[in-house]
Amino acid sequence: MVVPEDHIRQVERLSQNLFVCPPHASQVTALAALDSNDELQANVDVYKKNREILLEELPKAGLKKFSPPDGAFYIYVDISDYSNDSLAFCKKVLNEANVAITPGIDFDQKRGNSTIRFSYARSTKDIIEGAKRIKDFMSKYY
């Protein structure tokens, strides 16, 4: 930043308050979030149930090649038996089954053409409905 010589100290003080640490309000909010154990556990329980549903239902749809998720709330699935164009596959699923999944090409430009990513960070009702739609889609087209 270029400022007049006599303003340097004031700009330094301002910069320190803006960039050295998160704003005070954000820090207080983060602390409150950390104290929300019941809500956090409820979300974790929903994600766990949703993960179990997809791990059971995806193979029934023919999507059997995946590593069990360990960490976030995503399942990466190998679709090389059906397509080597994950973007086109995801577009077709969206247009035909009204289910949004993410093409692997978004994460790996070299090997992502044959993978897709499912998120299970939705309501359990949505996951059950999405799994049904995926099964119907796969049985219709593959």
Please identify what each model-predicted range represents:
Residues 1-142:
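PLP-dependent class I/II
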